[in-house]
């Protein structure tokens, strides 16, 4: 039995179903214009066990061994593999060598807003906090949002500087 031919796969890592649904309408058509052999996929982050959706840059996660951890620049590449790709590769029968490029879609959620623009608003309900305004973020817990923004901006700064990331033992354009 010979070697399986290498596939040309582009992955768009997304935070949730709405991102996936919006992007998978137009993006594959654009790649078809470049090369019809390119396969485009939209894996959604696995938050906990089978729960889908979330933001890898600003929250903590539970790994497959049941350990909860915060994602930081020192472990975000490993977290991307574990939370986006591990189960997805098994399901789609994809090998790291098949990946031509990884593109990650993230939102900033006010990560770069100055700390003094995060303000307490005790009139908000738990469901409405944080509440994003044009010039500030109103919330029930200022320290929590400031820390979230710090973590998120550190991770976004790191990811935006990456030309490649490690996927198992393979280096993939990012």
Regions found by a protein language model. Name each.
Residues 1-174:
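Acidic, divalent-metal-binding catalytic cores of TOPRIM
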């Amino acid at each position: 039995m010979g070697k399986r031919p290498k596939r040309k796969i582009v992955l768009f890592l997304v935070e949730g179903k709405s991102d996936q649904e919006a992007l998978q309408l137009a993006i594959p058509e654009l790649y078809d214009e470049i090369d019809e052999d390119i396969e485009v996929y939209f894996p959604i982050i696995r938050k906990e066990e089978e729960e889908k959706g979330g933001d890898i840059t600003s929250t903590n996660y539970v790994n497959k061994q049941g350990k909860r951890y915060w994602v930081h620049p020192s472990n975000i590449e490993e977290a991307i593999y574990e939370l986006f790709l591990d189960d997805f590769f098994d399901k789609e029968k994809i090998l790291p060598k098949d990946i031509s490029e990884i593109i990650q879609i993230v939102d900033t959620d006010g990560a770069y807003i100055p700390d003094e623009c995060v303000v307490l608003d005790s009139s908000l309900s738990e469901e409405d906090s944080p509440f994003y305004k044009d010039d500030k973020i109103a919330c029930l817990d200022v320290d929590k949002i400031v820390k979230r923004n710090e973590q998120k901006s550190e991770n976004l700064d790191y990811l935006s500087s990456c030309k490649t990331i490690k996927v198992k033992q393979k280096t993939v354009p990012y």
